[in-house]
UniProtKB/Swiss-Prot annotation:
Acts as an anti-FlhC(2)FlhD(4) factor by binding to FlhD, decreasing its ability to bind DNA, and thus negatively regulates expression of flagellar class II operons, decreasing motility in nutrient-poor medium. Required for resistance to host phagocyte oxidase. Interacts with FlhD in the FlhC(2)FlhD(4) heterohexamer, inhibiting its ability to activate transcription. Residues 1-237 form the EAL domain. This is Anti-FlhC(2)FlhD(4) factor YdiV. It comes from Salmonella paratyphi B (strain ATCC BAA-1250 / SPB7). The gene is ydiV. Pfam families: EAL. Transmembrane segments: none annotated. Belongs to the YdiV family. Keywords: Repressor, Transcription, Transcription regulation, Virulence.
Length: 237
């Protein structure tokens, strides 16, 4: 996809691994970076996303679905989950556009990731769009702890999985209360979702600290993103 910012950027898609406590692959999040036409500048999605039009967000979401279609047998064969971030602007389109809905619904292993800044998230199941999405697709709250939402939507059972925010984790990791605080979160949230995951695992030392705390899966710089051509290497380790 080509995005028109200060100059033209094109999207490049990668797969970000999610591992279990034994460092075995359980799923992959499809992420995008944006590169200038000359390749000299690259930006992550979080910097570009606020400047994308609804049409550009739609094109990026469709581009991710198209990539997922090319490697769906890999996900099925290895029993992996795929996560795609769902921008708020695309939520209603997904429910109203039958073709887009069908393209997403055909993948039984696909789960949609929603950020804490999703409009009306604090309404929980009273948010009609969010409730309808949860009826049709497994949802993941992608950055719990970012400080932009309450726990209502989690306790309302709208999310199959919850991922703790990487910045939240890395800030807390510097405190001596990290382990008991994480135990408290696990105890509070686990009964309201199928899987509680943790991001921000950038080192072996951090993985060793987090692994015994009761999380079901882990994501971070310890397992860098890979292009589609290197997917097979993730299951050969």
């Amino acid at each position: 996809m080509i995005a028109s910012l200060d100059e033209l950027y094109h999207s490049e898609l990668f797969f970000l691994p999610v591992m279990d406590e034994n460092a075995r692959l359980v799923g992959l999040e499809i992420i995008a970076t944006f590169a200038a036409e000359d390749g000299a500048v690259r930006m992550p999605t979080e910097l570009v996303a606020p400047r994308l039009s609804v049409e550009e967000q739609y094109c990026l979401f469709v581009e991710k679905l198209a990539l997922l279609e090319t490697c769906q047998h890999f996900f099925i064969q290895h029993k992996l989950i795929a996560w795609l971030n769902l921008p708020p602007a695309i939520s209603d389109l997904l429910l109203l556009d039958s073709e887009l809905f069908s393209r997403a619904a055909r993948f039984p292993f696909l789960e949609l990731a929603i950020n804490e800044n999703y409009p009306g998230l604090n309404q929980g199941k009273n948010n009609e769009t969010l409730a309808n999405l949860a009826m049709h697709f497994p949802l993941m709250l992608a950055n719990f702890g970012a400080g932009e939402a309450s726990t209502k939507a989690i306790f309302d059972g709208l999310f199959k999985r919850v991922m703790l925010d990487k910045n939240f984790i890395q800030q807390r990791a510097e405190m001596i209360s990290f382990e008991p605080f994480m135990h408290a979160i696990v105890a509070q949230i686990s009964s309201s979702c199928e899987s509680l995951m943790i991001a921000g695992i950038d080192t072996e030392a951090m993985f060793a600290r987090a692994a015994p705390l009761g999380f079901s899966a882990f994501q971070g710089g310890l397992w860098p993103s890979v292009p589609v051509s290197q997917l097979i290497k993730l299951v050969q380790r």
